[in-house]
């Protein structure tokens, strides 16, 4: 038995030693260049191949290198909650507003005008062709239709214009002058009578209207967005992506988006870059808003024309204020647009795509899905298809077109529509603001490819039937959610923390030799799907590539800002380029400042002396990515950062003290008075300490000598001078001693003055203690006497409260006992009743049998 116990003891001892030696403490290690990121909202900048247009004069030159690298990660994407799409909407609006350049206030034109509703230029009725006499073939145009060239297709009339006269002070403020102006009928509000009509410019009472003072017109621009240095763009490359996907597994990374074109229109999107040989849609995750990309196979196009030979002249009203007017000799014909392509099949495919969408809950019958326009009470930009053609705003009535694509019997079906032109329009980005555009001279024509459809999917119940309306929408911003909704802007966070067993200033660990990896700037995130262990071995090459890419992009931005410094005020891109430059510099300096504050400047792998704060949280170097690890330790970042800064401060303090000691190696420092003062002060402290030590030793020696003699403790001071010393018995001295000799050294010698001084100290200390005791006792007595009246009600209240609590406890206990007894009695009674009922039910067959037996007997 003892032998077994010894074996167990030895085994436990070995296990303890092995555990002590095998357990190694982990320390915080800083890694620079890891493939990790977080969502960002910094400004993007533009790149374009066309540097001739005014809107892109400040964009970076696009070299056509649109590189995308696949990343083995899973990321969430949302086209509506997306900083890329929001920036696109804001920037395009800024370009749109800059192109108009509103600067001349037209508030002085809010005067009463006398307008004609008679005459050759205003009374001509629109040229229309009755539906009954129009052949069906004439309602559908093609490239060979003769009416296209002359703008005489059935249903296209003359534009409703009005000549108005008004009086206003001109260059001479004391004299009024009569002016003549021609207006579109839709831009006036009139009250007519038999003789004349009094009209006002529309929206005079709601807004300050401004007219363009520069001849810029809104032309489409092609450009792409690029991320600032230190940032990247992730894109969901999944064909099933429909505007919202919390886990997209097919992700690519790039530094720029695809090329896109500025679009400002309702109902349809024109000249988009997302068209494919399929129809797909983006659906809002919490709403019925959608944007549908049309199949390019059907070759859908729209051709718009504004006939006429207009001239534009400035009218000087008041001093230095010019207003662009449009005198007309004859009424112009209406603007109109016609649609080419297989629209009927395209809309049928749109309906089938809606049915297949997982969020759709309506009918599966395409005959019950209709393409409709918005309600009649909406704004003109919503009720009509609103677009811009060479500076003129077209408001097109789409009833004929909807009747055609839906094949509505009994209605007018045409593949072209008539459009009205308005110069006072509602803005599409800021509610309630109006702008005024001067018309462009001559005949205008615009040709566009129709690439998308903006709509709301409305499911409703008509009796027992479920129907669906594809209601056309005026959300211009949806066009850019289709163009850029699959992108996501992220900030690369190259600094990461992980626990390792290596402490700072330890010997260098052996590293595996690997081939040099040539990575571009995007190659940093290409390693995002790799394990942490494999990624950490290539941090040197990655960090060098990262820094090189940041420096290169910064240099490009700096060059373009320097070259076009005088044009920064023209467009939004000048400001965004400067913001991007500042953002890049701030990010780089911030990372380097953090590394420097931890003592890890210009290091890819930096070991520290800070212990890892959570020993239970360690990474799986072979199976875990850096992005996954960063999400797990995100809550430790603040704590680790503070610990690293404290450790670095302590190290710098130690280095400072060491350098102060090393400074004595220089001969000249010996003559520095400030250095000597510290040592002089230290010497004074040493002398004072020696004096105090000497006093303590003296007191201890005096007390030791007092213990050798006898004296009554409470005797009076003179008594110890009369004390009879007790001598030790000793024999006759060997030699005769004279009076001058000191006698035997072992004889007792009394020191009366030391004893008297000690007695005096004891008496004073005793008096001091008695005084302190009496003072404290008196203070406590007075305090208790003062607090007694105030504490008495409190004590009484506490007694009442204690009594109430005890009574409440007893009441609860009594109620509990009563409830328990009641429940027990009720349960027993219920159980007896149930048992009797069950016995009665069980006895029924026996009673029946007994009854039958009695009946048979």
Swiss-Prot record:
Motif YXXV motif location, chain numbering: 710-713
UniProt xrefs under InterPro entries: Gp120_core_sf (IPR036377), GP41-like (IPR000328), HIV1_Gp120 (IPR000777)
Residue segments, region V4: 396-419
Cytoplasmic-side segments: 704-857
Transmembrane helix is among the record's keywords: yes
Signal peptide start and end residues: 1-26
Glycosylation positions in this chain: 39, 72, 81, 116, 121, 142, 150, 167, 193, 205, 237, 240, 271, 277, 288, 299, 309, 364, 397, 407, 447, 464, 469, 614, 623, 639
GO molecular function: structural molecule activity
Coiled coil, from the record: 627-648
Extracellular side: 27-682
Region (Immunosuppression): 578-594
Lipidated residue numbers (S-palmitoyl cysteine): 776
Chain ranges passing through the membrane: 683-703
Annotated stretches, region: Fusion peptide: 515-535
Pfam families xrefs: GP120 (PF00516), GP41 (PF00517)
Region (V5), start-end ranges: 464-472
Reported function: The surface protein gp120 (SU) attaches the virus to the host lymphoid cell by binding to the primary receptor CD4. This interaction induces a structural rearrangement creating a high affinity binding site for a chemokine coreceptor like CXCR4 and/or CCR5. This peculiar 2 stage receptor-interaction strategy allows gp120 to maintain the highly conserved coreceptor-binding site in a cryptic conformation, protected from neutralizing antibodies. Since CD4 also displays a binding site for the disulfide-isomerase P4HB/PDI, a P4HB/PDI-CD4-CXCR4-gp120 complex may form.
Misc remark: Some HIV-2 isolates have been described that can infect cells independently of CD4, using CXCR4 as primary receptor. These isolates may have an exposed coreceptor binding site.
Record's comment describing the protein's domains: Some of the most genetically diverse regions of the viral genome are present in Env. They are called variable regions 1 through 5 (V1 through V5). Coreceptor usage of gp120 is determined mainly by the primary structure of the third variable region (V3) in the outer domain of gp120. Binding to CCR5 involves a region adjacent in addition to V3. The 17 amino acids long immunosuppressive region is present in many retroviral envelope proteins. Synthetic peptides derived from this relatively conserved sequence inhibit immune function in vitro and in vivo.
The protein's name: Envelope glycoprotein gp160
Name of encoding gene: env
């Amino acid at each position: 038995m003892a032998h077994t116990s010894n074996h167990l003891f030895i085994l436990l001892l070995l296990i303890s030693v092995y555990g002590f030696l095998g357990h190694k403490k982990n320390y915080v290690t800083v890694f620079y260049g890891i493939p990790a990121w977080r969502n960002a909202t910094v400004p993007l900048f533009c790149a374009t191949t066309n540097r001739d247009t005014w809107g892109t004069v400040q964009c970076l030159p696009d070299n056509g290198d649109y590189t995308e690298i696949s990343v083995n990660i899973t990321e969430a994407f949302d086209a509506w909650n997306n900083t890329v799409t929001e920036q696109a909407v804001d920037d395009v609006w800024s370009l749109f507003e800059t192109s108009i350049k509103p600067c001349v206030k037209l508030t002085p034109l809010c005067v009463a005008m006398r307008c004609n509703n008679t005459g050759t230029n205003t009374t001509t009725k629109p040229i229309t062709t009755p539906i009954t006499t129009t052949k069906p073939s004439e309602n559908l145009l093609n490239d060979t239709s003769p009416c296209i060239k002359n703008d005489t297709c059935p249903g296209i009339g003359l534009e409703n214009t009005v000549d108005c006269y008004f009086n206003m002070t001109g260059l001479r403020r004391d004299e009024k002058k009569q002016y003549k102006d021609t207006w579109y009928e839709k831009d006036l509000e009139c009250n007519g009578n038999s003789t004349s009509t009094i009209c006002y410019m529309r929206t005079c009472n709601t807004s300050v209207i401004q007219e363009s003072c520069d001849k810029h017109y809104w032309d489409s621009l092609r450009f792409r967005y690029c991320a600032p240095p230190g940032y990247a763009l992730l894109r969901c490359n999944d064909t099933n992506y429909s505007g919202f996907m919390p886990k997209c597994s097919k992700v690519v990374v790039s530094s720029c988006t695809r090329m896109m074109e500025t679009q400002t229109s309702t109902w349809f999107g024109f000249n988009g870059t997302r068209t494919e040989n399929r129809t797909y849609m983006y659906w809002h995750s919490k709403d019925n808003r959608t944007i549908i990309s049309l199949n390019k196979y059907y070759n859908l196009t729209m051709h718009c024309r504004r006939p006429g030979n207009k001239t534009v002249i400035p009218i000087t009203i008041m001093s230095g204020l010019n207003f662009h007017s449009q005198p007309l000799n004859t009424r112009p014909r209406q603007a109109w647009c016609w649609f080419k392509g297989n629209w009927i099949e395209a809309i049928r495919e749109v309906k089938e795509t809606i049915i297949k969408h997982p969020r759709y809950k309506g009918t599966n019958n395409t005959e019950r899905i209709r393409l409709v326009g918005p309600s009649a009470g909406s704004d003109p930009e919503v009720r009509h298809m609103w677009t811009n053609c060479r500076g003129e705003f077209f408001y097109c009535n789409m009833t004929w077109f909807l009747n055609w694509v839906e094949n509505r019997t009994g209605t007018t079906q045409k593949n072209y529509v008539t459009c009205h032109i308005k110069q006072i329009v509602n803005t599409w980005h800021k509610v309630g603001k109006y702008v005024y555009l001067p018309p462009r001279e001559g005949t205008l024509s615009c040709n566009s490819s129709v690439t998308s459809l903006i709509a709301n999917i409305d499911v409703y119940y008509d009796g027992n039937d479920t129907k669906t309306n594809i209601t056309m929408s005026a959300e211009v911003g949806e066009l850019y959610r289709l163009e850029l909704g699959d992108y996501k802007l992220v900030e690369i966070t190259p600094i990461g923390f992980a626990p390792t067993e290596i402490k700072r200033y330890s010997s260098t660990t052996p590293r595996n030799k690997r081939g040099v990896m040539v990575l571009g700037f995007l190659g940093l995130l290409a390693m995002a799907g790799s394990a942490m262990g494999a990624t950490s071995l290539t941090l040197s090459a990655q960090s060098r590539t990262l820094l090189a890419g940041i420096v290169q992009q910064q240099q490009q931005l700096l060059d373009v800002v320097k070259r076009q410094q005088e044009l920064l005020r023209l467009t939004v891109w000048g400001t965004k380029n400067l913001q991007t430059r500042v953002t890049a510099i701030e990010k780089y300096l911030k990372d380097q400042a953090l590394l420097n504050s931890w003592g890890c400047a210009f290091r890819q792998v930096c070991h520290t002396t800070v212990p890892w704060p959570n020993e239970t949280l360690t990474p799986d170097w072979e199976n875990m990515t850096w992005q996954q690890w960063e999400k797990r330790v995100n809550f430790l970042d603040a704590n680790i950062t503070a610990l690293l800064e404290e450790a670095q401060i302590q190290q710098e303090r130690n280095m400072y003290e060491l350098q102060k000691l090393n400074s004595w190696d220089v001969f000249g420092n010996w003559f520095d008075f400030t250095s000597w003062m510290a040592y002089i002060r230290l010497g004074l402290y040493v002398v004072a300490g020696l004096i105090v030590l000497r006093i303590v030793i003296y007191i201890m020696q005096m007390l030791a000598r007092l213990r050798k003699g006898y004296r009554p403790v409470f005797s009076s001071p003179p008594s110890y001078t009369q004390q009879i010393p007790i001598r030790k018995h000793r024999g006759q001295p060997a030699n005769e001693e004279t009076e001058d000799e000191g006698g035997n050294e072992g004889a007792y010698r009394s020191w009366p003055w030391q004893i008297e001084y000690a007695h005096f100290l004891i008496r004073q200390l005793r008096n001091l203690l008695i005084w302190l005791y009496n003072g404290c006792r008196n203070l406590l007595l007075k305090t208790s006497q003062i607090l007694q009246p105030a504490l008495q009600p409190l004590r009484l209240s506490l007694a009442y409260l204690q009594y109430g609590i005890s009574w409440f406890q007893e009441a609860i206990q009594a109620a509990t006992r009563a409830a328990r007894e009641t429940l027990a009695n009720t349960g027993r009674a219920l159980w007896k009743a149930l048992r009797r009922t069950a016995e009665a039910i069980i006895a029924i067959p026996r009673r029946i049998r007994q009854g039958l037996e009695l009946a048979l007997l």
